[in-house]
């Protein structure tokens, strides 16, 4: 039972780190990255659909993205979705593909993005700590119900603390990498 609690906590912490990593990819860095369009939705036959599922997105240059819709009829819809998104980019339509030039971030905007990245990292660390707390509560309940001895529970708590510290460090590392990427000119 103790192993199940530790395993479940570790699985959820892994998912949290991955979610934080994905969350950070949506922050614009001034470099072309197809992942920046992950949250952009467009109407596709009346259904809101991510534009990443409606088109192929490539990076021909460090500051440019090419978006080639799978169906040419959806070109205008995708273009409008990008324009109306909060990404701050303006696509140009040449009839075959949409070209999106990524403007260089100002120093002030970069600092705002770093704050945003730190906030998302902090959210990830809070989620990891909440998973730890839930695991600790489950371990204490096992001990209280008599299903596990005090020594076993203490050893499991130490293990859970060690695992938690490792995952918090992973989140810190992911945020630090994003910060470095954001501050590069």
UniProtKB/Swiss-Prot annotation:
This protein's record includes keyword Protein biosynthesis: yes
Pfam family, one: RRF
Keywords for this protein: Cytoplasm, Protein biosynthesis
An example Gene Ontology molecular-function term: ribosomal large subunit binding
Subcellular location: Cytoplasm
GO terms, biological process: translational termination
GO cellular component: cytoplasm
Primary subcellular site in the record, as a coarse category: cytoplasm
Superkingdom of the source species: Bacteria
PANTHER family: MITOCHONDRIAL RIBOSOME RECYCLING FACTOR PSEUDO 1, RIBOSOME RECYCLING FACTOR
Role this protein plays: Responsible for the release of ribosomes from messenger RNA at the termination of protein biosynthesis. May increase the efficiency of translation by recycling ribosomes from one round of translation to another.
Family statement drawn from the similarity comment of this UniProt entry: Belongs to the RRF family.
Protein name per UniProt: Ribosome-recycling factor
Source organism phylogeny: Bacteria, Bacillati, Actinomycetota, Actinomycetes, Mycobacteriales
